[in-house]
C-alpha cells in the first residue's frame, strides 16, 4: 500500500501466542529466567518456555509429570485477568501508532494503521517500529495485515 492511500482502513492483527507465559516470565529475575517455566490450567501444562521443553516437559503433561522431569521447574497458574490487563496495557502502548486499537481477548490486538502510513514513512517503517517496540517490551507477536 502506498502513502497516497493513507486514509484507507488497513487492519494490523497482532497475535500474542505466548502471552499466558510472558505475563509471568517478563518479571523473573535473570537466575530464574533460565529455568524451566510452565503455565498450568487444571493441573495441566498449557504453556512452557524453551528450557522446560528442552528438559522433556510437553503441553498437556500434568503437574506431577512436569515436576518429576525437572525439580527446578517454576510453575504458575494461568491468570486470565493478568493476561487481559497486559493486553490492555499493550493496547494503550499501541495508541502511539493509531487512534483505532481494538482488543480481541484473549491474545489479539487489532490496529487500523491505514491513516498512519504517511506519518511513519510507509508500511515497512511502521511495522519495524511496532515489531521492535513489542520486542523491547518483552513480548512475542505474530502480525498479519488485511489488505
Regions found by a protein language model. Give the residues of each.
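Residues that scaffold, gate, or flank divalent-cation-dependent active/transport sites
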Residues: 1-110, 115-117, 122-132, 136, ...
Amino acid at each position: 500500500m502506498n502513502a497516497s492511500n493513507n486514509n484507507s482502513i488497513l487492519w494490523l492483527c497482532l497475535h500474542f501466542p505466548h502471552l499466558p507465559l510472558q505475563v509471568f516470565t517478563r518479571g523473573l529475575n535473570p537466575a530464574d529466567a533460565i529455568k524451566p517455566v510452565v503455565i498450568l490450567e487444571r493441573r495441566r501444562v498449557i504453556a512452557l518456555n524453551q528450557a522446560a521443553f528442552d528438559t522433556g516437559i510437553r503441553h498437556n503433561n500434568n503437574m506431577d509429570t512436569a515436576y518429576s522431569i525437572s525439580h527446578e521447574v517454576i510453575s504458575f497458574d494461568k491468570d486470565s485477568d493478568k493476561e487481559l490487563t497486559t493486553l490492555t496495557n499493550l493496547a494503550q502502548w499501541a495508541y502511539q501508532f493509531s487512534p483505532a486499537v481494538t482488543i480481541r481477548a484473549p491474545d489479539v490486538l487489532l490496529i487500523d494503521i491505514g491513516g498512519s502510513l504517511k506519518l511513519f514513512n510507509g508500511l515497512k517503517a511502521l511495522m519495524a517500529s511496532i515489531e521492535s517496540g513489542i520486542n523491547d517490551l518483552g513480548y512475542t507477536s505474530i502480525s498479519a495485515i488485511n489488505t
